[in-house]
Curated annotation (Swiss-Prot):
This is 3-isopropylmalate dehydratase large subunit. Its EC number is 4.2.1.33. Catalyzes the isomerization between 2-isopropylmalate and 3-isopropylmalate, via the formation of 2-isopropylmaleate. Binds 1 [4Fe-4S] cluster per subunit. Pathway: Amino-acid biosynthesis; L-leucine biosynthesis; L-leucine from 3-methyl-2-oxobutanoate: step 2/4. It is an enzyme of class 4 (lyase). NCBIfam families: leuC, PRK05478.1, PRK12466.1. It comes from the Bacteria. CDD domains: IPMI. Keywords: 4Fe-4S, Amino-acid biosynthesis, Branched-chain amino acid biosynthesis, Iron, Iron-sulfur, Leucine biosynthesis, Lyase, Metal-binding. GO terms for biological process: L-leucine biosynthetic process. Belongs to the aconitase/IPM isomerase family. LeuC type 1 subfamily. The gene is leuC.
Length: 455
């Protein structure tokens, strides 16, 4: 019997344990940041342990970094976390993409951009959106701080193998509809827990035709569908992306092995979902989890339970309204979901020649310094600034309310991030998850049908 892609990568990394029980996995790459690593490093010190594989451990600063004055960190806790990681990197011999360095940025962008993320690897990080790296045909998943310490000490991790869920996506995406709309539609349709206990393999002609940026967007939000893992078969698009990157010096001798990473025709999946995207619309969330979304043309649904009522109360909306009825106050282009170069290029096409409404605060936060530099070479910064956007330094920024970039209480934000929970972007902030194109088209203060304005 054939194997799934996920099974192939998993089985190659099992050091000990039987199927159906926790198995000891070898970890090929450990990515860390300033929030979930301090206690783990301290645990090593208390036990007088060394870092097992500093050569497989890479750090960046992203969650707490300011995006305006990056070297003036006013928050004491944020400053302590950042300086602690800088010291730990020195003490334990960890390569760090430090503040202001050419590669610094959001951890899930730094890995792919530097060539650290590669097909067939097991990759962990103390961050729930680590599934992003699964777009390369890797097994990548988020872990907690105690698990971070375990990987520090042993370069291994106990995990129970999940079931396999195949999501077969076909059809040509309509103009103005993107990878972000695909994953939002899946979560809206099947719920925030449909992937619980599964590894999601995204397949089909639509996936094959996506860029690596689009594939990363889809895998990034596997966790919002309840899954720890999202994975896509590596192909020539993947290999071309990895080739020539700083940490991909093993490319020539590895690519033939990477071509073996695919699900066999006779592989058995525990569940299969099929999706035709040929009539898919732009998606907009109305509530307080990613499942609470609609097609742009649809009204918001009736109240079915207490959770719906609470969401409507928090968001200041009512059933029957539409996305175009929302009075927006913020537009945020950023996050590990949609702050890559192609995202900014697409948004710039819509923004060019327009002006941000006086009632709108619009900011662009490139996900990494690499993206920022490439965007500036293309003149994207000028396009955004001429339209009235703020052009910021890289970081997690407004995706989460733990740095200076926050949405004011009661204000609606068109956001390219991944979570719309209560308080996610700041106390009382009202988040609407959309694609970069939809966010860019909302600069006049209202959501509009981006299919009518995309160029």
């Amino acid at each position: 019997m054939g194997q799934t892609l996920f099974d192939k990568v998993w089985n190659r990394h099992v050091l000990y344990g039987k199927l159906g029980e926790p198995q000891l996995l070898y970890i090929d790459l450990h990515l860390i940041h300033e929030v979930t690593s301090p206690q783990a490093f301290e645990g090593l010190r208390l036990q007088n342990r060394k870092l097992r594989r500093p050569d497989l451990t890479f750090a960046t600063l992203d969650h707490n970094v300011p995006t305006i004055d990056i070297f003036n960190i006013k928050d004491e806790i944020a400053n302590k976390q950042i300086t602690t990681l800088q010291k730990n990197a020195i003490d334990f011999g960890v390569h760090i993409f430090d503040m202001g360095s050419d590669e610094q940025g959001i951890v899930h962008m730094v890995g792919p951009e530097t060539g650290l993320t590669q097909p067939g690897k097991t990759i962990v990080c103390g961050d729930s959106h680590t599934a992003t790296h699964g777009a390369f045909g890797a097994i990548a998943f988020g872990i907690g701080t105690s698990e971070v310490e375990h990987v520090f000490a042993t370069q291994t991790l106990w995990q129970t193998k999940p079931k396999n869920l195949k999501i077969d996506i076909n059809g040509t995406l309509p103009t103005g509809v993107y990878a972000k709309d695909i994953i939002l539609h899946l979560i809206k349709t099947y719920g925030v827990d449909f992937g619980t206990g599964y590894a999601l393999e995204f397949t089909g002609e639509t996936i094959k035709n996506l860029s690596m940026d689009g594939r990363m967007t889809i895998c990034n939000m596997a966790i919002e569908g309840g899954a720890k893992y999202g994975i896509i078969q590596p192909d020539d698009i993947t290999f071309e992306y990895v080739k020539g990157r700083p940490f991909a010096d093993n490319f020539a001798k590895s690519v033939d092995k990477w071509r073996e990473l695919y699900s066999n025709d006779d592989a058995i999946f525990d569940r299969v979902i099929e999706l035709d995207v040929s009539t898919l619309e732009p998606q907009v969330t109305w509530g307080t989890n990613p499942e609470m979304g609609v097609n742009f043309s649809e009204p918001f649904p009736e109240i079915n339970d207490i959770n719906d009522q609470r969401a409507y109360d928090y968001m200041g909306l009512e059933p029957g309204q539409k996305a175009e009825d929302i009075d927006l106050g913020y537009v945020f282009l950023g996050s590990c979901t949609n702050a890559r170069l192609s995202d900014l290029i697409e948004a710039s096409h819509i923004v060019k020649g327009n002006k941000v409404h006086p009632n709108i605060t619009a900011i662009v936060v490139p996900g990494s310094r690499t993206v920022k530099k490439e965007a500036e070479k293309l003149g994207l910064d000028t396009i955004f600034k001429n339209a009235g956007f703020e052009w910021r330094e890289p970081g997690c920024s407004m995706c989460l309310g733990m740095n200076p970039d926050q949405v004011p209480e009661g204000v609606h934000c068109a956001s390219t991030s991944n979570r719309n929970f209560e308080g996610r972007q700041g106390k009382g902030a009202r988040t609407h998850l959309v694609s970069p194109a939809m966010a860019a088209a909302a600069i006049h203060g209202k959501f509009v049908d981006v299919r009518k304005v995309v160029v």
